[in-house]
Amino acid sequence: MFDIFKKNKLGGNGGENLYVNIGALLINVAKVDENYSEQEKEIIKKTLLELGLTKTDLKDVFKKSEEVEKNSNQILEFTKEIKNKDEDFKIKIVEALWKIIYADGVSDMYEMSLMRRLTGLIYLDSKIVGNIKDKIKNSFNK
């Protein structure tokens, strides 16, 4: 059985559904620019592991995340559980989202629009989001 029902590093019993939804959200953002790269997939997998998913469960959860994202028509369902998590958890998600956006070296208006909607849905202060964006963008420009 899945080990992901154990307490994750950031507190609370995450459960499989949380990780699948986070993965689906990250995949959705990665696909917005119609360039879903291996680098983006690696960022998504690394993020899931950093949030407490075990290596044993990564393959299955990632596959389910891709299926859920493919069969979904709105991002709201991916953010329901995230919005109730603590700020540190949300910051890790937003950092991963910006890493995915800047992985190809550019950001477009669709990615920016999606980020504004997402950060509103998870209730994270826009100043924090802006600081994270600048930090990630600068790390890719080095």
Task: Name what the model sees in each region.
Residues 1-28, 37-142:
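Small-residue-enriched hydrophobic alpha-helices in membranes
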